[in-house]
């Protein structure tokens, strides 16, 4: 009889720093009911990966669930597949950290009664040199997408077998995940999956179809709880798979104990197909979507898709400078604390991938996820002796100035407005400037491709198929920044300008200081910066801005001196962007010599003091991003701009105090 081997796997993960209620809801809607139903079908076998943050939460909150996993492992129904413990993208962390991360999760698997030999590759981000790290960690097989193999030139028909791949003389087995199964399971009726699997049957006993995808598809994604559990999809699926003589259910290890991989392939740097769209800069991503849609309309996509390639995962460091800066700070501290087990514990947590990128989930746009990464970078850096240094932190070829004392770390970019791009408090373990600017994303112009499938299609929509229209109340408030957001950004503005024009980026910037280079010299506890620039009115008026930034025990002091070569009436504004995330602010204009900011579940309380009264413009920085639930209009921080009238010369002092 012709048969097909079938490997069924799920990947369960919640990011470090996610809200407790999210863990709880995902547990109740997916992780628990899935395993309870699995227990009812002793013939069903599942390959499962649980991430470290999720296992830690389960151990603390639902310890009985671990007993259920142990019993399923004992019965031979579960094969544990590991990854880095804190779910890092392995390609984006140092080799030394990869080995520790994998060993930590292997240790946890042993506690559950399983000696894991396989890796679920986080976000399936593959690069060839991972082979050496994986083999050194005792890993025998790794799971990626069929897209990786197609990118290497293999046809779809060749992707129903695992292959070997090699790097530097080390060899590992690679299983391809079938993309069609990812879109069928669990969104279409069970019979569709069975029909597809039966269409793959063969007299080759080694032919195998692999499904391995997010466990959250089974109850957490929109509409799936009702479909998978209440309408009985999962029970029907397990019953159909285990009772079908043409389908031979296996785990990865069982397959490898019976069959040898088909041959040797070399896979390029890749992830799954959707990632090649998301990781492109927005303009290119829009073109990519248009190109894919054009190929589909012409009926050519399936034939030529192997040659359709977009960006790679590491492109996110190019697309989002804030992600790149956070990542390079993590690498910097990782190298410095490698021999300190206590500090290293924190840096391994800071490698959790979710906050570094953005696709169909919130990712980098979720402030609480970024905050957790920064918290752990700062906690690790506490173990290092404070020192002032000039170095290229983010590897862009231009030096940053890092000023540090026992309480604070300030990273200043002289080449970008002489502004503070990191102000980290060691006491609170927060980065006060963890603020994303408002960026245009390619999906803000909703392409035809995102229209949901016709309602007559059986089943439910995957989150990749949900149609989305931007609500009008959000569209009215939508604005895109021309500059990155930092602390001590220097503006020249017309005296008659309004807060609304300023916050919606409809105002005219008169100066050339916000994103231009400043010269600098180091001083004790800080740095002196200056720029000879201009105010551009009817003609260019030469202007000089000097600022002396000194770290204090509770923050910093900035002493300003502003000079215009000839009289011109304007407003000089100093903008401070703060990572206020838990208090929803509204635009406001007020006069003040000092004011407090209170963000109880975020950065806490701080005070900004001036030596002379100023007009203050305050507004929330809100970004529009997509998520599995639709649109997120998220406050990334709050901008505070202190405005002083200037005609020829101006001197003032700004003090930032942590309370």
UniProtKB/Swiss-Prot annotation:
**Catalytic activity entry:** Transfers a segment of a (1->4)-alpha-D-glucan to a new position in an acceptor, which may be glucose or a (1->4)-alpha-D-glucan
Entry-linked InterPro entries: A-amylase/a-glucTrfase_C, A-amylase/a-glucTrfase_central, Gal_mutarotase_sf_dom, GH-type_carb-bd, GH57_Enzymes, Glyco_hydro/deAcase_b/a-brl, Glyco_hydro_57/38_cen_sf, Glyco_hydro_57_N
The Gene Ontology terms for molecular function here are: 4-alpha-glucanotransferase activity; carbohydrate binding
Alphabetized SUPFAM superfamilies for the sequence: Families 57/38 glycoside transferase middle domain, Galactose mutarotase-like, Glycoside hydrolase/deacetylase
The function of this protein is: Catalyzes the transglycosylation of maltooligosaccharides, yielding maltooligosaccharides of various lengths and glucose. Maltose and glucose can be used as acceptors in the transfer reaction.
How this chain assembles, per its entry, is: homodimer.
Q: Which PANTHER family match?
A: ALPHA-AMYLASE-RELATED, ALPHA-AMYLASE-RELATED-RELATED
Family according to the record: Belongs to the glycosyl hydrolase 57 family.
Q: What is this protein called?
A: 4-alpha-glucanotransferase
**What organism is this sequence from?**
Thermococcus litoralis (strain ATCC 51850 / DSM 5473 / JCM 8560 / NS-C)
Taxonomic classification = Archaea, Methanobacteriati, Methanobacteriota, Thermococci, Thermococcales
């Amino acid at each position: 009889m012709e048969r097909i081997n079938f490997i069924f796997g799920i990947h369960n993960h919640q990011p470090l720093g996610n809200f407790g209620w999210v863990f709880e809801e995902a547990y109740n809607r997916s992780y628990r009911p899935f395993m309870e139903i699995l227990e009812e079908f002793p013939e069903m076998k599942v390959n499962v990966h649980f991430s470290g943050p999720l296992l830690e939460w389960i151990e603390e909150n639902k310890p009985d669930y671990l007993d259920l996993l142990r019993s399923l492992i004992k019965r031979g129904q579960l094969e544990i597949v590991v990854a880095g413990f804190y779910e890092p993208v392995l390609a984006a962390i140092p080799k030394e950290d990869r080995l520790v991360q994998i060993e930590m999760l292997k240790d946890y698997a042993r506690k559950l009664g399983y000696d894991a030999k396989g890796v679920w590759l986080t976000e399936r981000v593959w690069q060839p040199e991972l082979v050496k790290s994986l083999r050194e960690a005792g890993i025998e097989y790794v799971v990626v997408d069929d897209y990786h193999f197609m990118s290497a030139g293999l046809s779809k028909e060749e992707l129903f077998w695992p292959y070997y791949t090699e790097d530097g003389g080390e060899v590992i087995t690679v299983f391809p995940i079938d993309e069609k199964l990812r879109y069928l399971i669990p969104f279409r009726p069970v019979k569709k999956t069975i029909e597809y699997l039966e269409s793959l049957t063969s007299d080759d006993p080694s032919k195998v179809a692999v499904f391995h995808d997010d466990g959250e598809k089974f109850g957490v994604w929109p509409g799936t709880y009702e479909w998978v559990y209440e309408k009985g999809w999962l029970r029907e699926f397990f019953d159909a798979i285990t009772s079908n003589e043409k389908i031979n259910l296996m785990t990865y290890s069982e397959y490898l104990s019976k069959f040898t991989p088909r041959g040797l392939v070399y896979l390029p740097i890749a992830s799954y197909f959707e990632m090649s769209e998301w990781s492109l800069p927005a303009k290119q991503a829009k073109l990519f979507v248009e190109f894919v849609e054009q190929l589909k309309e012409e009926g050519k996509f399936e034939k030529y898709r192997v040659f359709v390639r977009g960006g790679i995962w590491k492109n996110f460091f190019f697309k989002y400078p804030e992600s790149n800066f956070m990542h390079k700070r993590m690498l910097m501290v990782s190298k410095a604390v490698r021999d300190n087990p206590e500090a290293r514990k924190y840096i391994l947590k800071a490698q959790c991938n979710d906050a570094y990128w953005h696709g169909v989930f919130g990712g980098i746009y979720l402030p609480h996820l970024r905050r957790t990464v920064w918290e752990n970078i700062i906690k690790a850096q506490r173990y290092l002796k404070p020192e002032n240094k000039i170095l290229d932190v983010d590897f862009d070829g231009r030096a940053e100035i890092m000023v540090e004392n026992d309480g604070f770390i300030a990273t200043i970019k002289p080449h970008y407005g002489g502004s503070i791009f990191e102000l980290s408090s060691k006491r609170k373990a927060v980065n006060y400037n963890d603020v994303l600017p408002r960026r245009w994303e390619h999906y803000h112009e909703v392409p035809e491709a995102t229209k949901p499938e016709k309602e007559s299609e059986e089943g439910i929509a995957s989150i990749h198929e949900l149609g989305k229209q931007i609500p009008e109340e959000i569209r009215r408030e939508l604005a895109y920044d021309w500059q990155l957001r930092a602390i001590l950004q220097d503006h020249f503005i017309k005296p008659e300008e309004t807060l609304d024009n300023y916050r919606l980026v409809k105002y005219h910037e008169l100066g050339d200081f916000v994103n231009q280079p400043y010269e600098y010299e180091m001083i004790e506890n800080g740095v002196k910066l200056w720029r000879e620039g201009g105010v551009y009115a009817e003609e260019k008026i030469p202007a000089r801005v000097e600022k002396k930034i000194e770290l204090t025990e509770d923050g910093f002091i900035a002493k300003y001196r502003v000079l215009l070569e000839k009289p011109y009436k304007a407003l000089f504004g100093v903008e401070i962007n703060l990572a206020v995330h838990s208090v929803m602010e509204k635009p406001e204009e007020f006069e003040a010599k000092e004011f407090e900011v209170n963000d109880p579940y975020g950065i806490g309380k701080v005070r900004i003091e001036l030596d002379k009264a100023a007009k203050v413009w305050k507004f929330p920085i809100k970004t529009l991003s997509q998520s599995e639930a639709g649109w997120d209009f998220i406050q990334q921080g709050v901008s505070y701009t202190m405005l002083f009238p200037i005609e020829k010369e101006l001197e003032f002092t700004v003090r930032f105090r942590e309370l």
